Amino acid sequence: NGHGTHITGIAASSATFGSDYLGIAPKSHIVSLKVLDASGNGVQSAFLQGLDWIHEYHRSYQIRIVNISIGSPGSEDSSASKELLKHVNALWDDGLVVCIAGGNHGPKPYSISIPGNSPKIITVGSSDDNFQMIGRKHFSSGYSGRGPTTSCVMKPDVVAPGTNIFSCSLNNRYTIKSGTSMATPVVSGSFALLLEKYPFYTNKDLSLIHI
């Protein structure tokens, strides 16, 4: 449906049609896993299968960063949510840098999407220069999910531009989209640049640097 295409372009577009459309880390190697259908909908079983695939094959494909620009607004205490968190946390324990969208159900508190509520991974919110909150500019956009989580974990961990982002679309076209899904590959791409310069950095190192 173009969601993943848009995300990939933000992170790693090689600017085939001009330098104005360069991604954050254009020389990155991309491994794409499709877990949504043509309408942009998906089921948790497909999501878990994708996470399991990364867990099994990340060394073979030299994967270091996992960008997850999907999530669920469900209850943190449900068995389905706990299962999802278990799989996401396993990727972090594998040494992977896991960046997950915080969701678009803000600005109220406790609105971080699952699995962005995990205390281990890096949860990304969306910033908007045109939105002002509590007298401060350049902070979260009005829709960006906010913490704390029900476990009192402060989220998101970092915010990045996510409103009116121009990137790749279907059929060799471009389009504008907004959301924490768009902000997440900005962070993932930035981490890719850091790992290119400092390949010995671990996911824990990067989790400290972004602060």
Provide a role label for each language-model segment.
Residues 1, 22, 129-133, 138-185, ...:
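Catalytic-core environment of secreted peptidases
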Residues 82-98:
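Catalytic-core regions built around general acid/base machinery
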Residues 51-78, 101:
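Short acidic, glycine-rich surface-loop motifs adjacent to enzyme active sites
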Residues 1-45, 59-64, 117-121, 148-155, ...:
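Subtilisin-like serine protease catalytic core
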Residues 19-20, 84-88, 108-112, 143:
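Short beta-alpha junctions and helix-cap segments that line functional grooves
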Residues 104-118:
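Glycine-rich, charge-decorated loop segments at or immediately adjacent to ligand/cofactor-binding or catalytic sites
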Residues 8-11, 31-37, 66, 111-114, ...:
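Hydrolase catalytic cores
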Residues 17, 36-40, 72-75, 104-108, ...:
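Solvent-exposed loop/turn segments at secondary-structure junctions
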